[in-house]
Every structure is written in structure tokens, then in C-alpha cells.
Amino acid sequence: MNDWSIEAARAGYNVTHWSQGFYGISDEGEVTVSPDPKNPDHKIGLNELAKDMVKAGVALPVLVRFPQILHHRVNSLCQAFDQAIQKYEYQADYLLVYPIKVNQQKTVVEEILASQASKEVPQLGLEAGSKPELMAVLAMAQKASSVIVCNGYKDNEYIRLALIGEKLGHKVYIVLEKLSELKMVLAESKRLGVKPRLGLRARLAFQGKGKWQASGGEKSKFGLSAAQILTVVDQLKQSDMLDSLQLLHFHLGSQIANIRDIRQGVSEAARFYCELRELGASINCFDVGGGLAVDYDGTRSQSNNSMNYGLSEYANNIVNVLTDICNEYEQPMPRIISESGRHLTAHHAVLITDVIGTEAYQVEDIQPPEEESPQLLHNMWQSWTELSGRADQRALIEIYHDSQSDLQEAQSLFALGQLSLAERAWAEQANLRVCHEVQGLLSTKNRYHRPIIDELNEKLADKFFVNFSLFQSLPDAWGIDQVFPVLPLSGLDKAPERRAVMLDITCDSDGIVDQYVDGQGIETTLPVPAWSAESPYLIGFFMVGAYQEILGDMHNLFGDTNSAVVSIEENGMTNIESVLAGDTVADVLRYVNLDAVDFMRTYEELVNQHIAEDERAQILEELQVGLKGYTYLEDFS
């Protein structure tokens, strides 16, 4: 690829669009991060950052967090709504509520809350969906009358804790998901002497499109039907507590790619709000829930991994619809709340790790088959000679298909005992040579060639064995086919010599990344610089800050990775603020009720029985170190 350039690299990996300006490729071909938007020229080279961490004793893989990205995401979303409110002369304000289920890590929650520390009136609250999350939120929420939204299924204890939150000075909205929860709230509030702030989750008829669309619509797991909502209103009237009903909540589903879906859902919910106001409810908060998407592939489309709108358009549509419908009903405009956790956290974290080895197809020269060889092999030789002699390009596809068919026949004949192992190996090499030659002759400009180019890219791709667990660090890539941008961290100033797929180190064939951002689309392989065992080859998995840590599992007992918090100072210096060690072998054994202390006793007994006395101390030390060691691979020498 003689026309390769840095611009070609940036376009090929589509960095400009999925990164939102936080990540880029330098003129030297290094992947960089610019976490502070106030100083876009202050960049950190991720390759050098990782090497510095390794020198400091932080083993790969390491999850790197950039808190300044969190700050920017919070403030940019609040700014978008503030501008929309001003544009449409909306008569209420906006509040951003962070649902901690997206990422409950202490550093993440604290940095989100700190992002508006300088504001006289912060526009931030927190959301909890379970008792453990509520306990965390009650302690971590900002002290001055902070808003807490309580979602999820509830028992009496959950409700009591939420009401205690009111006693502690918070504004706690208990969102009713089921009709039966109202009775519990009324009883517990009476016992505690606390007037509750109630919310309703409406089950809309409209259902957004996407992987999480089941969380919206009439068949959704959560929410109250129109009839159930009216029952709640009647029961509150009978209890003389209708003024406790202060919030309307709905949720269209996570990662809503199409802005028209958001607009339509908000329109339906706005009519719920106005109708409830006309029934006498004192609702003054309109909680649109989640749904604000993240453009994982950078295509700015309606695909499940993208979004066809920006922040301003998102805020404008919500504010515009609410303004129009409230004016139509002559009802006051409510405070707008959104629970946009994915948008806040996805970009801030990147997993950096190393390629520990590769496996590439070796295309070898072949000699013509022996005269007495089966006719099938002679046919394959003829296909190769026609191709290597540069046959008419119109015949390329035909030759390729013939070679594929011949290979399948050769494998079948071998299974029937009619072809020797050597003859099968020759057939496979002949097919490989044809594939390799055809790949170089096909043109992406020819639409008939494109499917075969994709097929050959996948067939001939190198296998990169990468030091991580897909199930621990990118569970959504395995579970729901989520796309995450993947990039080699250096060498991008040179044309990629290979295409590769990334395989993890678990003993599971599902441990493979099979979708990659490539230009304006998704491919099954990734263009990469050639791998060399002589120097570290680092890979970055981007946009893993939302859901991945808490959803990750311990398949093969690979545990949490090391992590670090990194920022850029005003003077441009890199600051590694904190490093947290990942799980040790003993840690993950403890998760499955296996005791490292018991293991050491067993090891000692076995060593005394089977190991010579002069070796015992060394062997026991190795076993002890193994239990204290990182669960990922560290020693390749």
C-alpha cells in the first residue's frame, strides 16, 4: 500500500468519529489520549504510558482510567440541555442522574460527582437499583440536598433505607415499579414518620429499537400500565398523599440509535405527565431514563453499535417535545432528568495489554503432483498454474471457487481413506497458494469481488494471542456481540502488513474478538502491523468504561486486571494518580471457596513426600509465589 499515510490510518481505524476527540493517532503512528479538552495539545502516548507502568512493576493487562474524560462528558451533557432549555425558553431545569450500575467503581463515582464541584448548584444526582447500590449512594451522594432516584424491585428494607435517606438530608425518589410496592411505601413511611417522594415508572406502548428494546414497551419487565397508574393515583388520593407523587419515569432501552425513537417515546410519556397533572398529581420531575447512545463504531448510523444524532440534537428533541406538549395542555414544565450512564463512562477507560504470540498461515512453494496422484490433485495444480500465469481476471472468482470445492473433496477423500496424509497436506497448500494469490488480485472497487475479499481476509488472517480474558474484560463482546474499537498502539505510520483476529488466553473457543471497526463499517479482521517477538506489541481495547467491569466473569479463574488512574496536569505532565492491583491467584480461588492456606499445607505434605530435601524450600517458595501472583501471563522468557 504505497499510498499509506497517517490520515489513512486515522480513517481506516475510524478514530476521529468513535473517539469523540479523546483518542487519536499521532504523526509518528502512536495512539494517543487527550483527556483534558481544555488543553487538546496535551497528549499521552498510550504505548509509552504502558511501558512506563510495566517498568514501575504494573503487569499487563492494565485498565487505564482517565477521569478528565468523565468530567468532560458530564459537563458537555449538562451544557447541551442548558442550551436547549434556553433555546426553547423551557421553564424548568435539567438534572443528570448517574445510575451507578453502569460502573460502581469508587473512583468513577467520585470523579463524576467531582466534575461539577466548582458549580454553585451542581446538576448531578445518583441512581440506585438495588439495596447494595442504595447503601453506596447514601454515603457517596453529594451532601447538600442531593437527588437520589431509587429504581428496581423493592422490599420493605429497601424502602426503609430510601426513607432513611430523606432523614439524612437527601431528596430520595422511590420509583414504583410494581403496584404492590405502594402499600409497602405507605406503611414504612408511616412507621418512620417520613413523607415519601414517589415516582411512577410508566410502561409505554412505544418500544425503541436495539439490543435492549425489551426494557421498553408493553411487555417490558418493569413499569406500570395505564390502568395500574390510575390505581396508584386513586390509592394516594384515598390516603391523602397524592402530593407525594412527584416524578414520572420511563425507559426506552439502552443505546437507542435513532433519534426519532427517542422523540416518539418522549412524546408519549409527556402525555402521561400532563394527564396525571390534570388528575391532581403534583409531578414536577420528568425522568427520561437511559437510552442516550454511544457511537462505538463511529459510523453515525442507526446500527446497534452507533447513533445517528449528537448531544445537542438529543437535548433539543427532548426539550422541544416537552415544551410543545406542556403548552398544549397548559401544564407547567417539569424538571428534566436523564440517567445517561453509558454516555458518561464508556470513553474514559481503555484496556491495554500485550500480544504474547501469533499464528500465521505459511504459504509454501508447491511442486506438481506425481503422475500417479489422484486426478483431483492434478485439477488443483491446473487451477494454480492458470492463476499464477495471470489468467483473465474474469476467471479469478471461478478459479477460487473451484479450488475451494477441490479442497473440500480432498478432505472428504482423506476421511474415506482414499487420499494419504501427504496428499491431503499438498491439497491444503495448493488451496492456500490459490487463496493468497487471488487475495492480491481482487479489487475492492469491483462489487463482485468484495464478498470474496472479506472471506479471504477472514480465512487468511493471522491469529494474535492476546494476554486478556474476553469474558472478564469485554463480556458484552461475547454476550451480545457488542463492538469495541481495537487498535495496535504503535506502528500505525506504516501500511498494515497483515490482517488479524484477537484471541484471548482462556480455554474457550468463544474467547475471540470477531468484530472490528474498519473504516465506515465492521469487519471480521483487523489490519495490523507485523508482529515481532523482539519487542513488545501492545493492543488497546477502547470504550470499555460502561458495564464491562461489573459484568465480567472469572472464566478459567482469570480475575480483575490491574488498573490505574491517569490525568494530565496543567503543565502537560502525565500524572499516574493511583494504581490498584488486580486479583491474585489466591483471590480468585477464594471466590470459589478454595483456601490458599489449605493448599499450602497440602503442597508441603506433597513436597515432603516426593521432593529431595535440598529442593524442598525452592519448590515451596515457587508454589507460594504462584498463589500470590497475577492471574494473567507475566513470564515469557
From Swiss-Prot:
Protein name as it appears in the record: Biosynthetic arginine decarboxylase
Protein family: Belongs to the Orn/Lys/Arg decarboxylase class-II family. SpeA subfamily.
Top EC class, one word: lyase
Obligatory cofactor(s): Mg(2+); pyridoxal 5'-phosphate
Protein's gene: speA
Residue sites binding substrate per the record: 286-296
Record's catalysed reaction(s): L-arginine + H(+) = agmatine + CO2
UniProt keyword terms in alphabetical order: Decarboxylase, Lyase, Magnesium, Metal-binding, Polyamine biosynthesis, Pyridoxal phosphate, Spermidine biosynthesis
Function: Catalyzes the biosynthesis of agmatine from arginine.
Single annotated GO MF: metal ion binding
InterPro entries cross-referenced by the UniProt entry: Ala_racemase/Decarboxylase_C, Arg_decarb_HB, Arg_decarbox_C, Arg_decrbxlase, De-COase2_N, Orn/DAP/Arg_de-COase, PLP-binding_barrel
Cited Gene3D superfamilies: 1.10.287.3440, 1.20.58.930, Alanine racemase, Lyase, Ornithine Decarboxylase, Chain A, domain 1
Modified residues (N6-(pyridoxal phosphate)lysine): 101
GO biological process: arginine catabolic process; putrescine biosynthetic process from arginine; spermidine biosynthetic process
Pfam family, one: Arg_decarb_HB
The enzyme's E.C. designation: 4.1.1.19
Highest taxon, organism lineage: Bacteria
Disulfide-linked positions: none
